[in-house]
Amino acid sequence: MKSEKIVITVLGILLVISIIVIGYLMIKINENSINIEYSEDAIMFKYNYERLNGKKNSDGNVYNTLSIAINNPIKYVNLEELVNIIDTEDGIIYISSPTCPYCRATVETLLQVVKDLNISKIYYYEIFTGNDVANYDELMKELEEKEIVKVNNDSKYSWGVPVLLQTRNGEIISKINGVSYELEENQSKYDSLNEEQKEIVYNRYYDALNK
């Protein structure tokens, strides 16, 4: 009987200790969760792309479904900042739009390449924004001279997105426009890519950024 009481007492003590330890660990986990902060730009980038998941555009085309990591390294820039970064900084620049089907088809693969290469910042310019700046024409002319945009027959600027640039010492050392994969039969540009197409995109972006 005495030994049974000892066993029960020991088990009770171990139970109390276990509860205390578990409680402490849960508190620390909650504290760590609360202290995690994600940049507003990363959250906005995720939202802007994912909010169109499964939605139809004005032509009835359905946007593919994306899952963007909330800790992505995106930093939004305006048109003037974009030109200044190209002229003066060492950096990587992504020019795109959430409504561009080719951009949506390749953005997850781009972010995977960025993660694999441990790239901590991607400057992001979203086209169709910043057209109301006072020096818009001057800025776009400079981008045209750098062959980042083109002027169409109707005198409107064309970006050829998605565009990926890497700059160093004020020079563009790598540039990718558009996509290089081919669509399969019955595959729409709005559809997600197959594994072979993803590999083509991955290798293209990896080679461009691994310099």
Predicted regions and their residues:
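Loop/turn elements at helix/coil->beta-strand transitions in domains of secreted/extracellular proteins
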Residues: 88-92, 117-121, 161, 168-169
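C-type cytochrome heme c attachment motif
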Residues: 98-105, 162-165
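N-terminal leader/targeting and pre-domain segments
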Residues: 7-15, 21-88, 189-211
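Short active-site neighborhood of thiol/selenol oxidoreductases, capturing the structured segment around
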Residues: 84-100, 110
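Thiol-based oxidoreductase modules, predominantly thioredoxin-like and allied folds used
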Residues: 67-77, 95, 119-146
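Non-catalytic, surface beta->alpha helical segment in thiol-disulfide oxidoreductase systems
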Residues: 154-211
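Positively charged n-region of N-terminal signal peptides that target proteins for export
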Residues: 1-6
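Typically the conserved alpha-helix immediately C-terminal to a functionally engaged Cys/Sec
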Residues: 102-117
